[in-house]
Amino acid sequence: MSLPDATVVKAFLLDLQHRICAGLEQLDGQASFAADSWTRAEGGGGTSRVLTQGAVFEQAGVNFSHVTGAAMPASATAHRPELAGRSFEAMGVSLVIHPKNPYIPTTHANVRFFIAHKDGAEPVWWFGGGFDLTPYYPFEEDVREWHQSAKNLCQPFGDDVYPKYKKWCDEYFFLPHRNETRGVGGLFFDDLNQAGFDKSFDFMQAVGNGFLTAYAPIVERRKDTDYGERERDFQLYRRGRYVEFNLVYDRGTLFGLQTGGRTESILMSMPPLVRWQYAYTPAAGSPEADLYDNYLKPRDWV
């Protein structure tokens, strides 16, 4: 089995962050990303790049981090208790994009690499990541295209890869207290190492490189759609689900907070504006009801 090489992974992640930011700036056409580099007392650091108040994107954050620690946190060992007490090295790129126009979906993507060390033992390493889409006023063609892009990038790695990671995404981005998915899904994978380092790294790269290929056409198609106060209010209400999921369930958020990570970078996934409304129910037959009735439950899209 090929040995893990954190150096090449880090180089890819830094380049990926740069390319995604450049692509988003081109889509926005007005605003640019501000870079904010930081260091972590316990070891490591990163660069957060944030775009605010653009023509298309209300806020977009693309974060690179590379951190080390003396002991794996509870969030990382809950499903792998044999790793408790190991030192660790974690690196990744994580992004969340909150568009202005309610007809453009919010999206999230992440690719990451972990190594857990223990004296006298082989290092335990794995890749994880994925991307998912959260529309407010969904269009079926957009969702199908999104999933087709996900399926296309998975295809070279086997016929079973897309269905497996699509299902995992539906299960992971689910809010039990709301009994609904966070959005229309995409891909989610974790603990990837069975095929060896090179092939596992190839797949992680395919996911990272495939994100903008999947998202950019949807932005281009919807960015000039007219909207009013009603659509904006619903967008802000639905953004509340994003906050609920990230603060209550998301393993990445919990990992960052439990390892003493940089709070500003961890919480840059939060939308800049959001609202809650008591006992909201969309009117039957409305565009808002269409989201609940047809999109917030797992479906086969391709």
From Swiss-Prot:
Gene3D superfamilies: Coproporphyrinogen III oxidase, aerobic (3.40.1500.10). The keyword Oxidoreductase applies. Transmembrane segments: none annotated. It is found in: Cytoplasm. Keywords: Cytoplasm, Heme biosynthesis, Metal-binding, Oxidoreductase, Porphyrin biosynthesis. Its EC number is 1.3.3.3. The keyword Metal-binding applies. A divalent metal cation binds at residues 98, 108, 147, 177. Residues 242-277 are annotated as: Important for dimerization. Its main location: cytoplasm. It comes from the Bacteria. It is an enzyme of class 1 (oxidoreductase). One of its GO terms (biological process) is protoporphyrinogen IX biosynthetic process. Its cofactor is a divalent metal cation. Pathway: Porphyrin-containing compound metabolism; protoporphyrin-IX biosynthesis; protoporphyrinogen-IX from coproporphyrinogen-III (O2 route): step 1/1. Belongs to the aerobic coproporphyrinogen-III oxidase family. Homodimer. Involved in the heme biosynthesis. Catalyzes the aerobic oxidative decarboxylation of propionate groups of rings A and B of coproporphyrinogen-III to yield the vinyl groups in protoporphyrinogen-IX. This is Oxygen-dependent coproporphyrinogen-III oxidase. It comes from Shewanella oneidensis (strain ATCC 700550 / JCM 31522 / CIP 106686 / LMG 19005 / NCIMB 14063 / MR-1).
